[in-house]
Amino acid sequence: MPFFLWITIACFSISFLPPSPLVAKEVIVAIGDSITQADTHWTVNGHRNTIQGGWVTRLGNLLEKEFPGEYEVINKGINGDTATGVLQRLDRDVTLLQPDIVIIAIGTNDIFARLSADPSSTPDAYQSTISRIFNKLQRNLPDTTVFALGMTTSLRKYAHIRFGNFLPQQDDMQAVFNDYNNILRKLTKDYKYSYVDLPSQWPEDIEESWEFCADGIHPNDAGYDLVASILHDTLRSTVLRPKQKNDTRSSVMP
């Protein structure tokens, strides 16, 4: 066979070889409020400072370091959001992405609304809304693993001092947060989801806890590192796994 003809046949054959499949990336969606969005955080004097990503970005970095190219972490946090807001955008921001893992971090603004005497933001209303969120997830994403992140505060009884008239005086802010965290804890158990007990790993001492907070609610850099580390350890001990070579997508890059 002439050499040029052999080269032509070889090149033609190579061009029609099936493309190598990609290793499937597992998708993690984090949905919540400004603590999840974390493009800025508040200082005590009320000024906003840009930070280099919050716990979602940092969790993604930890996963990429340990499992290169295997996990995609998507941030669906929105500043000021409540449980009702998450319910309203659940289909668009979670279901359509078909995630393998969902992390829900919502409730702090519901607590603030309750303290401001908003009749639509009672613990019962919060429980009802979270139940509806979980119902939709179970119906639309039955194979998805769901985590609910507990809420923390460093305000304790100093809310009225730190925030002025934004919050009324509250003698035991932690007790209010505990009420809502207990709702999350119970519902995750009822729906066979997982509650991430962040409050139990947050510093109890009021002064020490401020080393991890920008304003008593939003974490600072050290706080976001701590949240990301706790979530990473939680995921690692429950659902994270290295991908196998035959774990591939049905579609491939052209």
Where are these regions (language model features)?
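Positively charged n-region of N-terminal signal peptides that target proteins for export
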Residues: M1-L5
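Bacterial N-terminal signal peptides
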Residues: W6-S15
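A short, charged, Gly/Pro-tolerant segment at domain boundaries
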Residues: T248-P254
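Alpha-helical cap/lid subdomain in secreted, periplasmic
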Residues: K25, R58-G69, G85-D247
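Serine-esterase "nucleophile elbow" of acetyl-processing enzymes
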Residues: S20-K76, R89-Q98
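Acidic/histidine-rich helix-loop elements
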Residues: Q37-G53, G77-T82, S116-S121, P168, ...
